[in-house]
UniProtKB/Swiss-Prot annotation:
GO terms for biological process: cytoplasmic translational termination. Responsible for the release of ribosomes from messenger RNA at the termination of protein biosynthesis. May increase the efficiency of translation by recycling ribosomes from one round of translation to another. Belongs to the RRF family. It comes from Helicobacter pylori (strain G27). The keyword Cytoplasm applies. This is Ribosome-recycling factor. InterPro entries: Ribosome_recyc_fac, Ribosome_recyc_fac_dom, RRF_sf. Gene3D superfamilies: 3.30.1360.40, Ribosome-recycling factor (1.10.132.20). Keywords: Cytoplasm, Protein biosynthesis. The lineage of its organism: Bacteria, Pseudomonadati, Campylobacterota, Epsilonproteobacteria, Campylobacterales. GO terms for molecular function: ribosomal large subunit binding. One of its GO terms (cellular component) is cytosol.
């Protein structure tokens, strides 16, 4: 019974850490990632469709991305979607592909993006703490319903705190690594 609560708590906290990693993939660091385009939708025959589902997106070098649409008639639509997304770059359409040339980041931009990474980390910590609170409430309910003793309840809450501390430590490490990658020139 308590083991099920521990396992569920670990799973939920792991999902929060994975969500943080996905959020980090949308932040630009020294090298431009194709994930920076993940949120861009293209009007594909009247349906908003993810950019990576209407063409291939690849990184040519540290500051250049190339989009090769599977249908050439989508070039203009992809170009328009990128301009509307306001990601700080103008698409370069050569009739076959679209190239995005990202300028090198300034120190100020790096600091702002590092600040965003820290905010994402704080959001993940809040999610982890909410998971801890839910788990502790389940344990307290078991104690109240006389299914476990007060000592078992205290030990269970201590175990949940250990699980929480591990998750917070992983989040802090991820944030530190991301900040270092962003601030590295």
């Amino acid at each position: 019974m308590l083991q099920a609560i521990y396992n569920e708590t670990k799973d939920l906290m792991q999902k929060s850490i994975q969500a943080l990693s996905r959020d980090f993939s949308t932040l630009r660091s020294a090298k431009v990632s194709v994930n920076i385009l993940d949120h861009i939708k293209v009007d594909y025959y009247g349906t908003p469709t993810a950019l990576n589902q209407v063409g291939s997106v690849m990184s040519l070098d540290a500051t250049t991305l190339q989009i090769s649409p599977w249908e050439k008639n989508l070039l203009k639509e992809i170009e328009r979607s990128i301009q509307e997304a306001n990601i700080g770059v103008n698409p370069n359409n050569d009739g076959e592909t679209i190239k995005l040339f990202f300028p090198p980041m300034t120190t100020e931009q790096r600091k702002l993006i590092a600040k965003d990474a820290k905010a994402m980390g704080e959001k993940a910590k809040v999610a982890v703490r909410n998971t801890r609170q839910d788990a502790n409430n389940k344990v307290k309910k078991l104690e109240k319903d006389k299914e476990i003793s007060e000592d078992e309840s205290k030990k269970a809450q201590e175990q949940i705190q250990k699980i929480t501390d591990e998750a917070i430590k992983k989040i802090d490490e991820s944030v530190k690594n991301k900040e270092d990658a962003i601030l590295k020139v």
